[in-house]
Design a protein with these regions (language model features):
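Conserved phosphate-coordination/catalytic loops
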Residues: 60, 83-86, 214, 291, ...
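Conserved protein-kinase catalytic-loop position immediately C-terminal to the HRD catalytic Asp
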Residues: 243-244
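Juxta-kinase regulatory segment immediately upstream of eukaryotic protein kinase catalytic domains
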Residues: 1-59
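ATP-binding pocket architecture of kinase catalytic cores
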Residues: 49, 53-189, 232
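An alpha-helical support segment within catalytic cores of ATP-dependent transferases
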Residues: 44-45, 140, 153-238, 248-260
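Active-site Asp-x-Gly
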Residues: 192, 230-235, 248-316
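Charged phosphate-binding loop/patch that engages nucleotide di/tri-phosphates or the phosphate backbone
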Residues: 9-16, 22-23, 32, 299, ...
């Protein structure tokens, strides 16, 4: 960060973080955001440190679109790029204020030229996907129990009465993208029926861009609103890959044996308020079915098999 830059905190955030009873509607979000210096583990990264960082982290997305991830002084992770979404930073602030789950703290978020920079807490660990195949069953059981508790806490938050981002903005997921910013596609939505209709509209937009009639869009428009109904807005991570779960080794206090425990859930880019089936239903079409992970997810989340089957059809329509 350039020396002498005027630091403005996210309006109202300091009091929000200190007041756990603050209603979501009182949270005001704007950029730039810098956490107070006495709440930082060290000086915030300078621009030259970010530009010349030698340690980067792997990402499941193309860095040109999902952003670059670099580690600074083993204190900070900086995610940056022209397509990095502000929603991730706002979600981390929301989590800190509303929940007690392992997730990175947000230390700064700002724009520099055409790039968004999200400066987060560095949490050491390795991804669950890296070690899962070699884990003994008893350690898998421990980890799944921890994850069940984390996601139960998230899902227990009272419904805010809308489907959208934590800032009460558009649904932060590519299935609800509209170049024109059409609110019938992007949301936010107060009715699940409109949430489902938006998926059909997005499908129609994609097929129209290809110069073809969307017959599947017609099917989705006819059936999604009635087939996907009765699901309350639920706080959702939205990307439950094993690569988004960090674990660390700790010594079992009873046996003295080292085992893996949950260190953090990361990558909150698409987090927000979705129908209660979405956490399970969205990840279901992405299962590889080459090990026990799909079955294990049912120990973390209650399964929604019918809704998941429909979302598999949606995924094939929107992404292929």
């Amino acid at each position: 960060l350039a020396s002498g830059r005027v630091r403005r905190t996210l309006i109202g955030l300091t009091s929000i973080i200190k007041n756990k009873k603050t209603d979501l509607r009182e949270m005001i979000f704007s950029l730039p955001y810098y956490r107070e210096s006495d709440q930082l583990p060290g000086p915030l990264p300078e621009q030259h440190e970010i530009d010349h960082a030698v340690r980067s982290l792997p990402t499941i997305r193309n860095p040109d679109y999902g952003g670059h991830l670099v580690v600074i002084r083993d204190l900070y992770v900086v995610k940056y790029g022209p397509y990095v979404a502000e929603n991730e930073g706002y979600a981390l602030l929301f989590i800190e204020q509303k929940l007690s789950i392992p997730a990175p703290r947000l230390y700064a978020m700002y724009r520099n030229e055409d790039k968004l920079y999200i400066v987060m807490q560095y949490i050491p660990g390795i991804t669950l996907g890296h070690i899962w195949p070699s884990l003994p069953e008893n350690n898998k059981t421990v980890l799944l129990g921890e994850l069940r508790s984390i996601f139960a806490d998230m899902r227990s938050l009272p419904s805010p009465g809308f489907y959208g981002s934590v800032t009460q903005g558009p649904v932060p997921h590519r299935y609800f993208f509209s170049r024109e910013g059409n609110p019938a596609i992007t949301g936010p939505f107060t009715k699940e029926e409109d949430f489902s209709k938006a998926i059909a509209l997005r499908s129609r937009q994609i097929w129209s861009d290809r110069g073809r009639h969307g017959w599947t869009s017609d099917f989705l428009a006819r059936h999604l609103p009635s087939a996907l109904s009765g699901h309350q807005p639920t706080f959702t991570h939205g990307d439950l890959y094993r690569e988004n779960i960090l674990v660390k080794k700790v010594k079992n206090s009873t046996s003295g044996v080292e085992e893996y425990r949950i260190a953090a859930i990361i990558d909150w880019e698409t987090a927000g308020w979705y129908p209660s089936y979405w956490e399970y239903g969205y990840i279901f079409p992405l299962f590889q079915w080459d090990d026990d992970w799909p079955e294990s997810v049912e120990s973390i989340l209650d399964p929604w098999p019918l809704e998941a089957a429909l979302l598999r059809f949606v995924q094939e329509d929107l992404e292929f």
